[in-house]
């Protein structure tokens, strides 16, 4: 499957982010692959700590691919896993038709009891 483009670029998901990591630390690390257009760290409302993942957007597929291809990333002694956040679904081959009879040729079903009941006053 191919990475899907968002409105403005390509979004990667980074998992394994340390709960005390800051946006600045994450952005500094991932700026090595190209300018970061957007960065989102989801925080736990109760604790205020990072929930363990980040979404990072790059302008080009090449920049995002460099980040995904890097296998030795870590931050605050936590190993990071990186992948594309959105993928395009695979193209489907057209399905062969099961029936050769068109719907307009289907036999007409009559409901005599219902027709009689509806005709009565």
Swiss-Prot record:
A single GO molecular-function term is: mRNA binding
Q: Output compositional bias ranges, type Basic and acidic residues.
A: 109-121
**Main subcellular localization, coarse class?**
cytoplasm
Annotated Gene Ontology cellular component terms: cytosol; exon-exon junction complex; nucleus
Coiled-coil annotated residue ranges, if any: none
Positions of the UniProt region annotated as Disordered: 90-121
Which SUPFAM superfamilies does the record associate with it?
RNA-binding domain, RBD (SSF54928)
Q: Where in the cell is it found?
A: Cytoplasm; Nucleus
Domain of life per record: Eukaryota
- Report keywords, A-Z: Cytoplasm, Nucleus, RNA-binding
| Domain RRM span(s) in chain numbering | 10-87
InterPro entries per the record?
A: Nucleotide-bd_a/b_plait_sf, RBD_domain_sf, RNA-bd_8, RRM_dom, RRM_RBM8
Q: Which GO terms describe its biological process?
A: mRNA cis splicing, via spliceosome; RNA splicing
The UniProt entry, under Gene3D superfamilies, shows: 3.30.70.330
Q: Where does this protein have compositionally biased stretches of type Polar residues?
A: 97-108
Protein name (Swiss-Prot/TrEMBL) = Uncharacterized RNA-binding protein C23A1.09
Q: What is the source species?
A: Schizosaccharomyces pombe (strain 972 / ATCC 24843) (Fission yeast)
* Organism lineage string: Eukaryota, Fungi, Dikarya, Ascomycota, Taphrinomycotina
């Amino acid at each position: 499957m191919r990475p899907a483009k968002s409105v403005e670029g390509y979004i990667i998901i980074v998992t394994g982010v340390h709960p005390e990591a800051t946006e600045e630390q994450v952005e500094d690390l991932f700026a090595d692959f190209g300018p970061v257009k957007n960065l989102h760290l989801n925080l736990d409302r109760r604790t205020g700590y990072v929930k363990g993942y980040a979404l990072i957007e790059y302008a080009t597929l090449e920049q995002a691919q460099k980040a995904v291809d890097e296998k030795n990333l870590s931050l605050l002694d936590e190993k990071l896993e990186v992948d594309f956040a959105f993928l395009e679904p695979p193209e489907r081959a057209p399905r062969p038709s099961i029936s050769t009879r068109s719907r307009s040729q289907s036999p007409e079903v009559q409901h005599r009891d219902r027709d009689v009941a509806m005709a009565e006053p």
